[in-house]
């Protein structure tokens, strides 16, 4: 389970690029299994980047612990650590931005787990462990049947003549 609980919420008013609708948000007691996370660290002037002294999701120490978990004898170069931290920050920023757009599309001023979950499932083919996807049905492209292929071949053949 993650540190935010099963259904974390983030108020979109803390993001400068997302302008929430003036709709009122429901009181916290009315939403089952929800907790408010609060504002995300980072200022609009820094491009939303988190400075090392703020609460980063992935720090150098956490990255080193992860590497030791995979191979206790492995040591990353400083440049590699910086690059991996940058990639992680960029990934998180892009996911949060897309999830905020989904929340705005729902006409909500609150970012919910289902927004992040939908983006990760559709764009990255990732599932968040511990979160059910009853509300989000799997998105699968329809496979083409043999009959359809034959019809399309016939259409192509007749249009070439």
From Swiss-Prot:
Phosphothreonine PTM sites in chain numbering = 43, 59
Q: What Gene Ontology terms describe what this protein does at the molecular function level?
A: DNA binding; DNA-binding transcription factor binding; protein heterodimerization activity; RNA polymerase II general transcription initiation factor activity; transcription coactivator activity
Q: Any transmembrane segments, and where?
A: none
Top-level taxon in the UniProt lineage = Eukaryota
Q: Where is this region: Disordered?
A: 1-56
Cell compartments where the protein resides? Nucleus
Q: Which InterPro entries match?
A: Histone-fold, TAF12, TFIID_TAF12_dom
The UniProt keywords, alphabetically, are: Isopeptide bond, Nucleus, Phosphoprotein, Transcription, Transcription regulation, Ubl conjugation
Q: Which residues carry this modification: Phosphoserine?
A: 51
SUPFAM superfamilies hit by this protein? Histone-fold
GO CC annotations, alphabetized: nucleus; SAGA complex; transcription factor TFIID complex; transcription factor TFTC complex
Polar residues compositional bias, start-end: 1-17, 26-37
The primary location reported for this protein is nucleus
Q: Where is this cross-link: Glycyl lysine isopeptide (Lys-Gly) (interchain with G-Cter in SUMO2)?
A: 19
- Residue ranges annotated for the Histone-fold domain, each copy included: 56-128
GO BP annotations, alphabetical order:
mRNA transcription by RNA polymerase II; positive regulation of DNA-templated transcription; positive regulation of transcription initiation by RNA polymerase II; regulation of DNA repair; regulation of DNA-templated transcription; regulation of RNA splicing; regulation of transcription by RNA polymerase II; RNA polymerase II preinitiation complex assembly
The task this protein performs is described as:
The TFIID basal transcription factor complex plays a major role in the initiation of RNA polymerase II (Pol II)-dependent transcription. TFIID recognizes and binds promoters with or without a TATA box via its subunit TBP, a TATA-box-binding protein, and promotes assembly of the pre-initiation complex (PIC). The TFIID complex consists of TBP and TBP-associated factors (TAFs), including TAF1, TAF2, TAF3, TAF4, TAF5, TAF6, TAF7, TAF8, TAF9, TAF10, TAF11, TAF12 and TAF13.
Subunit structure, as described in the record: Component of the TFIID basal transcription factor complex, composed of TATA-box-binding protein TBP, and a number of TBP-associated factors (TAFs), including TAF1, TAF2, TAF3, TAF4, TAF5, TAF6, TAF7, TAF8, TAF9, TAF10, TAF11, TAF12 and TAF13. Component of the TATA-binding protein-free TAF complex (TFTC), the PCAF histone acetylase complex and the STAGA transcription coactivator-HAT complex. Component of the PCAF complex, at least composed of TADA2L/ADA2, TADA3L/ADA3, TAF5L/PAF65-beta, SUPT3H, TAF6L, TAF9, TAF10, TAF12 and TRRAP.
Q: What family does the Swiss-Prot or TrEMBL record give for this protein?
A: Belongs to the TAF12 family.
Q: What is this protein called?
A: Transcription initiation factor TFIID subunit 12
Q: To which species is this protein native?
A: Mus musculus
Q: Source organism lineage?
A: Eukaryota, Metazoa, Chordata, Craniata, Vertebrata
Gene responsible for this protein: Taf12
